[in-house]
Amino acid sequence: MRGYLLEFATIFTETLLFIMPYIHSLSATELASNSQKKVIVGMSGGVDSSVSAYILLQQGYQVEGLFMKNWEEDDNDEYCAAADDLKDAQAVADKLGIVLHQINFAAEYWDNVFEYFLEEYKSGRTPNPDIMCNKEIKFKAFLEFAAEELEADYIATGHYVRRREVDGHWQMLRGMDDNKDQSYFLYTLGEQHVGQTLFPIGDIEKPQVREIAQEQGLITHDKKDSTGICFIGERKFTDFLSQYLPAQPGVIETPEGQEIGQHQGLMYHTLGQRKGLMIGGMKEFGDDPWYVVDKDMARNVLIVGQGADHPRLYSNGLIANQLHWVDRTGPTSPMKCSVKTRYRQEDIACTLTPEPDGNVRVMFDEPQKAVTPGQSAVFYLNEVCLGGGIIESYIR
């Protein structure tokens, strides 16, 4: 018996020492205060939300989970596998001893995310539905449901971002893990959303998240990260999009106006794209690969150029609209900051200038490649995410 107790004490101590750097040392007063707060964790069936729930329990909160189903397409292993995700979320909830609620937001997702996705592609732009999903579903529908129906004090998610209160105002900061920082996807949050949301793994790196999950015996510890767009799943993008938008074939031209091929629809192509153009083997043009360098929407023409450094792939700046600022005010005069025009991109030094029409003009310190209308431009001041907007056009 003594040996068993000694072994148990050793394991408990090792586990405690392992997780303490990631959950922070809390005073008795803080633990007592947290025990009066109810937190609803958005649980997706992945490792990040699983560990988020675990950490919040260690911090003394009253924790419950919520599984959201946002798409009504047939779920099976080939597509979104929502049934498997729910099963994993329930297994984690059972392991942690917490309640798991379920909610269907498919109607809200269709109206506010998917229809936007289709309209943008119909216009020849390249949208990011994950950003719209965060804005309309996770930090609107979910937040409202948790507060009104489940009487939550906070919601929590497994996003790799941090928050900080300064002079009574909430800031959103990049996640500590540079490889996983997700502030790019959350720039539409206002400071009131940031104040109502806990991000338990924002100051942890992904390998440590998996280690914590494994130490605690959570079934999701080795589950692959979700990638791509859930409602498309493993299907070919062109096959999926053609179910909802009619193809509009047109010609492919060089920047000089020479016709060299046919495309099936501008919506299937994005700036900087190399694969899938079906225009190889033309000896008179040499061996350099072709890239999409522009779209002429008025003529329904796809413009391609040769070489990864073709001049028309580069822009000196951009115009952004549909702006969201975390502090809800934004800059009123030109400012130096940095911008990302796509996820996991290195910061681009720039000058941001508010325009009279409500847009912003962004000029890069150095020319940038494949700035794509429809994508988001997200602005930073050191580690603080200021906000962002949709790229309306590029400046060459």
Curated annotation (Swiss-Prot):
Predominant place of localization: cytoplasm
The record's catalysed reaction(s) read: S-sulfanyl-L-cysteinyl-[protein] + uridine(34) in tRNA + AH2 + ATP = 2-thiouridine(34) in tRNA + L-cysteinyl-[protein] + A + AMP + diphosphate + H(+)
Got any disulfides in this one, which pairs?
A: 133-230
Q: List the residue ranges of the region (Interaction with tRNA).
A: 180-182, 342-343
Query: Record's Pfam families?
Result: tRNA_Me_trans (PF03054), tRNA_Me_trans_C (PF20258), tRNA_Me_trans_M (PF20259)
Q: Where is this region: Interaction with target base in tRNA?
A: 128-130
**Subcellular location(s) of the protein:** Cytoplasm
- Chain residues that bind ATP: 42-49, 68, 158
- Give the keywords, sorted: ATP-binding, Cytoplasm, Disulfide bond, Nucleotide-binding, RNA-binding, Transferase, tRNA processing, tRNA-binding
Enzyme Commission number(s) from the entry: 2.8.1.13
Single GO term (MF)? tRNA binding
Q: Where is this site: Interaction with tRNA?
A: 159, 375
Active-site residues, as the UniProt record annotates them? 133, 230
Q: What's the superkingdom here?
A: Bacteria
One GO BP on record is: tRNA wobble position uridine thiolation
Q: Report the GO terms under cellular component.
A: cytoplasm
Which EC class does it fall in? transferase
So what family is this one in? Answer: Belongs to the MnmA/TRMU family.
NCBIfam families assigned: PRK00143.1, trmU
Cite the PANTHER family for this sequence. MITOCHONDRIAL TRNA-SPECIFIC 2-THIOURIDYLASE 1, TRNA 5-METHYLAMINOMETHYL-2-THIOURIDYLATE -METHYLTRANSFERASE
Q: What does this protein do?
A: Catalyzes the 2-thiolation of uridine at the wobble position (U34) of tRNA, leading to the formation of s(2)U34.
- This protein's name: tRNA-specific 2-thiouridylase MnmA
* Organism for this UniProt entry: Pseudoalteromonas atlantica (strain T6c / ATCC BAA-1087)
User: What gene does the UniProt entry assign to this protein?
Assistant: mnmA
